[in-house]
Regions:
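C-terminal active-site subregion of NodB/CE4 polysaccharide deacetylases
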Residues: 24-122, 127-129, 182, 186-278
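Short beta-strand and adjacent tight-turn residues that come in two discontinuous sequence segments
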Residues: 148, 178, 240-241
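Sec-dependent N-terminal signal peptides
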Residues: 5-14
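C-terminal motif of bacterial Sec signal peptides marking the signal peptidase cleavage site
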Residues: 16-19
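Cell-envelope/glycan interface and biosynthesis
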Residues: 131-132, 143-150, 158
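Positively charged n-region of N-terminal signal peptides that target proteins for export
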Residues: 1-5, 21-22
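Acidic (Asp/Glu)-rich catalytic clusters
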Residues: 134-143, 160-176, 232
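Charged helix-capping and loop-helix junction motifs
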Residues: 158-165, 192-197
Length: 278
């Protein structure tokens, strides 16, 4: 009788131990299953941004600035359609490649590579010939431009309609800001001015083109340090003309040259003489 009792106890203990082992294994599996998996991507460090000093030391990309493209209107800011076409042709024939502001930003900030002989074509003031003459001419050579919009001009005579602006964005061009009414940044006194000239027009323009507006051209190319600091909150790059660049905000003071009624050959010479390309 005692032997039977001992045998039964032994069997029960064995079953209990076996059950505990199974439970431990199941608990271990559950713990492994519930442990969060760290993806390899999350371990990759964010790319390091260049310092202002490093940005200023980089070779400049030639950036052209056009205003009027029309016949019968002489002045520093005007070129004829024939001259504009000749400019685009010699640039294409000379092996230049147009780049976007996004490419320029990545080059300046992250040292990304650019195509051989890069340059940028920009347009100020929203004039209708930018859509009707400049864009088709550029597209013929595979170029894309940057159109800085003065938003007070929407749908007015001699200026682009909102549909034309939206179409430029759809066709691969970049649409940027040129203020509401061309008031210079140096005259913005308070948050009311910034709301009127930058914040509200930027939001409206973004609804028109259906994408963020990340680039700015200073009215008259004029800036001050305070304005550059404030604009850095809204734009990746802001473009000046021939003024000295800001040592603290080089991205908000990128050089351009006003393109005049000149021969194609002179244009190339001016580009080489003006920009620190090496």
């Amino acid at each position: 009788m005692n032997k039977k009792i001992i045998l039964i106890c032994t069997i029960c203990c064995g079953l209990a131990i076996s059950g505990c082992n199974k439970a431990s294994k199941n608990d271990a599996k559950a713990e492994v299953a519930n442990t969060p998996v760290v993806k390899r991507d999350t371990l990759v460090a964010a790319p390091t941004k260049n310092t202002p000093e490093q940005i200023l030391a980089k070779p400049e990309v030639p950036i052209l600035c056009y205003h009027r493209i029309t016949e019968g209107h002489e002045g520093t800011y005007t070129v004829t359609p024939a001259t504009f076409a000749a400019h685009m042709k010699i640039l294409a024939d000379s092996g230049y490649h147009s780049i976007s502001p996004d490419q320029l930003y990545d080059y300046l900030v992250y040292n990304k590579n650019l195509p051989e002989k890069p340059f940028m074509i920009t347009f100020d003031d929203s004039r209708v010939e930018h859509s009707e003459i400049a864009a088709p001419t550029m597209e013929k050579y595979g170029f894309r431009g940057v159109f800085f919009i003065m938003t007070i001009t929407y749908n007015k005579k001699n200026y682009m309609t909102t549909d034309q602006i939206a179409q430029l964005a759809k066709n691969g061009h970049t649409v940027g800001m040129h203020s509401w009414d061309h008031t210079m940044v140096t005259k913005y006194k308070d948050s009311i001015d910034w709301q009127k000239e930058v914040v509200a027009p930027k939001a409206k323009l973004e609804t028109i083109i259906g994408k963020p507006v990340e680039y700015w051209a200073y009215p008259n190319g004029v800036y001050n340090h305070e304005g550059a600091e404030e604009l850095s909150k809204y734009f990746k790059i802001s473009f000046i003309l021939s003024s000295k660049r800001d040592s603290i905000q080089p991205l908000q003071t990128v050089h351009r040259i006003i393109t005049t009624e000149c021969s194609p050959e002179k244009l190339l010479k001016t580009m080489n003489q003006t920009f620190k390309m090496k």
